[in-house]
Amino acid sequence: MSTILIKNAKMRGHQELTDLYIKDGIFAEIGPGLSYPVDEVIDVAGKLVSAPFCDAHLHLDAVLSVGKPRYNMSGTLIEGINIWGERMQGLTKEIIKKNARDVIKWEVANGSMFLRTHADATEPTGTVVEALLEVREEMKDLVDLQIVAFPQECIFTEKGHTDLMENAMKLGCDAVGGLPYMEYSPEDGLRDVKFVFDLAEKYGALIDIHCDENTDDQSRFVEAMARETIVRGMQGRVTASHTTAMHNYNNDFAFKLIGFLKKAQMNMVTNPFANSCLQNRTDGYPRHRGHTRVDELLANGINVCIGSDDIMDPWYPMGKGSPLAGAALLMNYAQLSGYPQVAQLIDMITCNSARTMCLTGYGLAVGNPANMIVLDAESEFDAIRLQSECLYVIRHGCVVCRTVPARRTLEFEGKQENIDFRLTAENL
């Protein structure tokens, strides 16, 4: 295993530049002015270094399927679900694995090393779950992949779905998912939530439920999730994804709910790409923004993180697996442009997501696994503004990706000038 010395790094929360000595796959020493005989010295010249990004919400079974068999012309969640049902006819394990592996590589090149994907566990042959379990094993040297057993067709809409969910957990999924707001009735939605908690308790698994992903101010299954979490003592292990309906809740109810979520130590995942594109399609004007109450949740100390959700699939036609791009989008449409909030955006794709995924040994600290990224930026603000490339991605002490940034040369007034979109002393 190689030894690496990272020189002149700007660590988050530190004013002075520092060095990081990597040996035997861990951070052996961190501090200024380090000098060791090593296999490689990387002088990052003041660039921002960070723990790797964590993408806490993906659907790797559906990635790269946009337009197959048809495009989502309405842009709605429901049409996306219908297209996925059509796509499943004849979908092979080989296609799922190829597409998932490609997007995982995109994620790594963009600085992600810890991913959580939902896998369609109600697909009757088990092909989807088996494919992603194989990918998890095949890609383990590159990424840590958590798999959620996700009931794409709900749990109580057809007989046999409960058995399929349990089988997915027996096969080795890491978390149990749910879809209560899409069940046939509110009563079945509550049964959905309780079933998920029961199954998670049985297998000692985490929970990540697609919850209230609509604009209905009466869709309040997240409240049931908070109750079950508190009653069962599962604080910190439960995640509610989306919760876009919270945007439209009565403010008095939202105030009470946020108190429950804090007591339950719930993790919340917002998915800026899909939420901004899919939600409020029937609003007309004025049109709501279609995201959960990110600012209020953060202000109350609730753990909120960002997921990519969909990448070129029936629900969202764009994307390249970049958590930093998701953070930049959320800054705009959740109005998180205050200077301290920009740092929070980076937290939402690093330490907050790591907390959601219950990761251990995460972060730039002596003794931790040497997992880190070097961004082509000098500050968190510029990382968001520029949506910076990852110059280096280091996994267990090995450089697994190197990026050479684009070089732009402007020719004007008889001179050549390099353009990098950064401020200089003359701008101040």
Each predicted region: which residue ranges?
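Divalent metal-coordination and catalytic microenvironments
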Residues: A9, G25, G46, H57, ...
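His/Asp/Glu-enriched, well-ordered alpha-helical/loop segment
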Residues: L206, R227-V238, A274, L278, ...
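Active-site microenvironment of metallo-dependent hydrolases
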Residues: M1-T18, I22-A28, P32-L34, A343-L428
